[in-house]
Amino acid sequence: MNMMMLKNVLLFLDIDNENIEETNEMGETQKKLTYAKLTIENIKSLDENSYFDIVEPMWETISIYDGYDEYIQSAQTFTLEQRYLLAITWYFAEVSNGGHYQFLYNPTGIVWEDAIKGFKHFAMNEYADNFQKVVDYCGGTISFGREERYHMLEILEEKYGEEFFKILDEADDFIYDYEGEENELNYIKSHPEKFVFEGEYESFYNRR
């Protein structure tokens, strides 16, 4: 994921969070039904500026906030590859913003396994290996429950201190510094049938 794609993802994340805050504070932001149609032809001509068009239906539909069962259930209308792409997108957005600690601490940590599987599936093996080092340090597996992940981080921090943060920092730096092929786009455009979509989903909009 190059810097332009990443900036687009982070911008959307900021806008999404801002809209939620406005809803809470002013009640001026509401949800609306958005219709989208992504055909094989659309996907084959995809570029980095329209990358999030592929992700947005999953982003708005698949829940990461209500437990693992709901996460899987809310993803039922999408392909496995679409679910993996969402997990990878969440991973990059969170790690690039606040590191692996933030990714695991926040609700986004629920997608940790799909992120690793997605990296492997999309032939992004360098990313898979980098994240696997963090998972291995956490004992080889990570809970899908946020409270359990929070306690895991507390225990590791208390037990290993600076060593723990060194492992995280090294994994973070890899994400910040890595310049590789655009494997997500390559995979999507090589397998467009896995990412087609037609339907409606709820999204936020500002009434002002």
Predicted regions and their residues:
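Extended, alpha-helix-rich binding/interface surfaces that flank or overlap catalytic cores
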Residues: 19-95, 101-112, 118-208
